[in-house]
Amino acid sequence: MLKSILFLCLLAPATCTSGAQDAAAPAPEAGPPAMFPHPGAARYFFAGQANIIFQAHAPFHSPYEGPNSLLSRGEYKTSMIGTIYTGFELVRNPRYATDAIFDVEAAGGRGLSEALGLAGFTNLDVVRNPSLGSTPYLARYEVHQVVGLTDTMAESERTPYSLETSLPQRRLEFWVGRMSLPDLLDLNSIGTDSHLQFLNWSIDNNGAWDYAANTRGYTDAAVAEYTDHDFTARYALAAMPTVANGIDLEYNLKQASGQNVELELRRGPGIFTQALRQRKGAVRVLGFVNHADMGDYREQIQLFLKGLTPTPDITAHAPKPTMKYGVGWNFEQEISENGRVYTQFGWNEGQHESYAYTEIDQTIAAGGDYAMKAFGRPNDKFGITFVTNAIKRDHQEYLKLGGMGFLLGDGNLNYAREDIVEAYYNYHAWKGVYYAFDEQFIAHPGYNQDRGSVMVESVRMHVDF
């Protein structure tokens, strides 16, 4: 399947006319243009996407390397991912709609240094276990249920996870099945889409949110959502992996689970001018509590210092459920017809093992994007953001003493925050075909000021079918 999708990607631009658009170009569509029409009136939903990312970096300063280091020699890698989205409206009652959703996906290629050595890795599409191969798999299978609490309806954008084009203004929604939690939580219209926006996974998702997921980023979960005009509350209960960054899930929820609560207000703060308050904006606050068989950094350091282990090993502990918790905050605001800004903050307690997403205990990000409509390119976009990531003292000491995480481990650590600047230009070539040019500057890769800095260049081709 993946090879067929990628062949169509490469074939598509050959049939297009010049990408030049004059000042009289039409306004952007409600959603990104696609290769084929997606009729909103149909009971079925059928779409697809393919994303090909080429990344490279030149040699950079590095007095030493460990098993989990970003390689200091120059390297280049290509990742590929293709998805087929399907859905069917089982019940079309406006107040009590029911959808069945099935998505098939295939991922191939590699990440730089096998996606090791960076807390904020440069490519969200990379699977962190290359031995899984590129065999297609069922990424999502879920049921979506709407329970209307009013007869007043509001227009809604059709998505692969919600097929309705209108929904009750006050409603409950439920999703049950296999999904990725960032499909529904911690969304941000400026920086959550590695297909058309930023590539770095500590920008596209809150890096300190150690959300329940297997290696591919999916879990079995139940999500409940309450919406009332410009306010939404969400709760998610999800299965954790059996081991850190593992492909298998633990279904004994008494032993392991991920619980998440999010509150969202789609209204500009009162400190804004009246003009800004009338533009689109949102504030989201997220809290999570994970239970799993996670190691304790301080305990492993003490065992090493007592001479009981040759190096600190976060996985070498008696099986026992432990708890990890954290909070996240993200804010976005439209400031003009074409310009938007956002900020993001995340924190977790950091004492226990980074388990499912990445090795970040605190993150702060700020950036924005600008649509090039004024330049006759209504579907082109430029974006830039800065993110700074950190880990707690016990995590720092663990890495300094030679401990390995599932992503990091230089064999030593001269600690500093990992700082990243990313900028991209996304060029709309024809219908659903896009090319992006992306640059990422990374200071202190893997929190190590002895190494780097490093510049990562990327070219992305994306097709929406």
Features from the language model and the residues they span:
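Short loop/turn motifs that connect adjacent beta-strands in outer-membrane beta-barrel proteins
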Residues: A34-F46, A58-P59, G87-A100, G148-R171, ...
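Hydrophobic, lipid-facing positions within transmembrane beta-strands of outer-membrane proteins
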Residues: Y44, T78-I84, Y137-V143, L172, ...
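Transmembrane beta-barrel strands of outer-membrane/channel proteins
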Residues: A50-A56, F102-A106, F174-R178, Y235-A239, ...
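Residue-level signature of outer-membrane beta-barrel architecture
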Residues: F88-R92, Q145-V147, R178, E225-D228, ...
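Surface-exposed coil loops of outer-membrane beta-barrel proteins
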Residues: L116-G133, Y137, T152-E264, D313, ...
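Outer-membrane beta-barrel "beta-signal"
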Residues: R140-T152, I384, S453-F465
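Signature for the C-terminal beta-barrel architecture of outer-membrane proteins
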Residues: W201-F331, N338-V341, F345-H352, E359, ...
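Outer membrane beta-barrel transmembrane domains
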Residues: E264-L265, L286-P321, E349, E353-I442
